[in-house]
Amino acid sequence: KGCSFVEAVETLMGKAAVMPTVTVKPKQKTEPKILLLPDKSASTDKITEYLFGRGIDYTIIQYCIDKGLVFESLPYHNLVCVGFDEKNTPRYASFRATNDRRVLGDCSGSDKHYSFRIADSDSSTVHLFECAIDLLSYATLMKLEGKDWRQFNLVSLAGVYSPKQKIEDSKVPVTLGRLLEKDKTIRRIVLHLDNDIAGRKATKALQTILSDKYEVVDDPPQY
């Protein structure tokens, strides 16, 4: 009498005032990813031929090889594009076949906070691309126009950016987020994302979530 339905049931079942013990597991510290790079070939002939066949300027190819930004892997002679942290330690790498097969992906342990980029300048403008090949193609176009491509801040997003269904709730890609956090001089962001549905959706999302702090320019590839 005078008790609630739930209390009555608990009393009848012999569970009144008996609460199960709840064990709270401590949060495990996230260990830094360990990047597993493939073996490196002594030759760069296959990747040079592949990139040159994709229209990339030879000087830019050689620059990337000399800087360790790209290398040819063993045993499959894939093109590997590498991203480094502030200590010049490889933290990200993608691979793609240099033959007709569509084999591509990220190397195990890749951290997209440190994706492939060419950034030898203190420019307040950052140029964003979906992948390393798009970035290198743009650098080639700048060279053809007589501009010093090394003075551009060129960053790959390491894949197609997928915004939230409700665009306003989208998050900044981790690559760009880290860059904006580290470099407070950036004022302008130029988006060179593809003209397909995914690229247009990603562009709209980035314009929506970034335009309050930065000048955001849409400049898709003209091909």
Regions found by a protein language model. Give the residues of each.
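Short active-site oxyanion
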Residues: D122-V126, R188-I189
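Glycine-/acidic-rich phosphate or pyrophosphate-binding loops and their flanking alpha/beta elements
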Residues: R102-S124
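Short active-site loop/helix that positions an aromatic residue
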Residues: K1, L135-L144
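Conserved mixed alpha/beta catalytic, RNA-binding, or beta-rich assembly cores of soluble enzyme
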Residues: L128-I133, A158-S162
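TOPRIM fold recognition
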Residues: M142-Y223
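Non-catalytic accessory segments of DNA primases and related replication-initiation nucleases
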Residues: K1-Y50
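Active-site-proximal, Lys/Arg-enriched surface segment
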Residues: G53, T59-V80
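Terminal peptide-recognition signature
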Residues: L51, C81, N88, E130, ...
